[in-house]
Amino acid sequence: MSQIDKASRRQKIKDRSRGNVQGTSAKPRLCVYRSLSQIYAQLIDDVNGKTILAASTLSKDNSALKGSKSELCRIIGNQLGQKALAQGITCVVFDRNGFRYHGRVKALADGAREAGLIF
């Protein structure tokens, strides 16, 4: 499967699932983006069009983290979950953004669940 086919396949899956996954201020959308070397996660309120929280491997407080990519994703998910709980957010809607629920995406979700987020 060529790189173009993979990208267009992911975009189709993303477009299909976006109709079903909607975040509110009470239950925001946990959106995950995975690049080859980094991972980004955001809590988004789709009703108001605002990003509530964000965490990534590129943020300043995570620049000194060491470990495998999956371990870093679990840490990022845990940090995002703790920040969300501090703001009073307990339930979220998980948006895998067209990526398979496997590997780093699953590790981030597991880290967020360990922190106490419900989805």
Swiss-Prot record:
The keyword RNA-binding applies. Residues 1-23 are annotated as: Disordered. Keywords: Ribonucleoprotein, Ribosomal protein, RNA-binding, rRNA-binding. One of its GO terms (molecular function) is 5S rRNA binding. GO terms for biological process: translation. It comes from the Bacteria. GO terms for cellular component: cytosolic large ribosomal subunit. Belongs to the universal ribosomal protein uL18 family. HAMAP family: Ribosomal_uL18_B. PANTHER family: 39S RIBOSOMAL PROTEIN L18, MITOCHONDRIAL, LARGE RIBOSOMAL SUBUNIT PROTEIN UL18M. This is one of the proteins that bind and probably mediate the attachment of the 5S RNA into the large ribosomal subunit, where it forms part of the central protuberance. Part of the 50S ribosomal subunit; part of the 5S rRNA/L5/L18/L25 subcomplex. Contacts the 5S and 23S rRNAs. This is Large ribosomal subunit protein uL18.
